[in-house]
Regions:
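Rossmann-fold cofactor-recognition segment
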Residues: 5-21, 29
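A conserved structural motif in NAD(P)-dependent oxidoreductases
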Residues: 184-192
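A glycine-rich helix->loop->beta "capping" turn
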Residues: 28-42, 48-50, 75, 79-81, ...
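A hydrophobic alpha-helix adjacent to the NAD(P)-binding/active-site core of NAD(P)-dependent oxidoreductases
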Residues: 11, 56-57
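Short, flexible catalytic-loop segment of classical short-chain dehydrogenase/reductase
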Residues: 160-171, 175, 180-182
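Catalytic loop of short-chain dehydrogenase/reductase
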Residues: 46-50, 54, 76-151, 163-166
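Hydrophobic structural elements of the Rossmann-like NAD(P)H-binding subdomain
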Residues: 41, 84-86, 156-159, 169
Length: 192
């Protein structure tokens, strides 16, 4: 059985950008799947062009990490389960290392949100930098937990699918799309 967690149209309808929404998703999964989960795909996120810097941080990083950690015991019940998160190939160098370090080493959402609240949310380069930072931090988190999780029968990996036509990319401005298409990625846009 596939269970879809979404803001509006899921089997579990919650806001993964909020701590309450994440906990509700975890609680509902524990109720719906008491015998465990075979796997999970963490794919919720917003682009750097969304205009809400806090949302980028809360959804793209904390949403994934909190839900994955929250269902870890369910994943362990099904020895051989798998978690796939979505990172990004551009996340290796264009983000803010200070934000990446705060996300990975401190993990204090309120502190990071306080820091980004003083940034210019109307500046696309600021939003894109935070987007890249969350994806890089997510890849680092996956790398950090992967050995421990694997020892307990749970594989976890971050994939970088490249450009994909999704609801997120459909709302990007023409300038943002041109910048994205200028990246030297040897592929066409993928389909959702």
């Amino acid at each position: 059985k596939v269970i879809n967690i979404d803001l509006k149209d899921g089997d579990i309808c919650v806001n993964l950008a909020s701590q309450e929404g994440r906990q509700s998703a975890v609680d509902q999964l524990h109720t719906m799947c008491p015998d465990g989960l075979d796997g999970m795909i963490c794919n919720a996120g917003v682009s750097g062009a969304c205009g809400n810097l806090g949302l980028i941080i809360s959804l793209n990083y904390f949403g994934t990490v909190a839900v994955a950690n929250g269902v870890y015991d369910l994943l362990k019940k099904k020895h051989g389960s798998c978690v796939v998160t979505v990172s990004n190939t551009i996340s290796q160098g264009a983000g803010r290392k200070d934000i990446v370090d705060l996300l990975n080493n401190i993990g204090d959402e309120k502190r990071v949100l306080s820091l980004v609240s003083s940034m210019d949310s109307t500046n696309l380069s600021v939003g894109n930098s935070l987007y890249v930072s969350t994806k890089y931090a997510l890849a680092r988190w996956v790398r950090r937990v992967s050995a421990t999780w694997a020892a307990n029968g749970v594989r976890i990996n971050a994939v970088a699918p490249g450009n994909v036509h999704t609801a997120m990319t459909a709302t990007m401005s023409t300038t943002a799309k041109m910048a994205l298409n200028a990246l030297p990625i040897p592929t066409k846009y993928g389909q959702e």
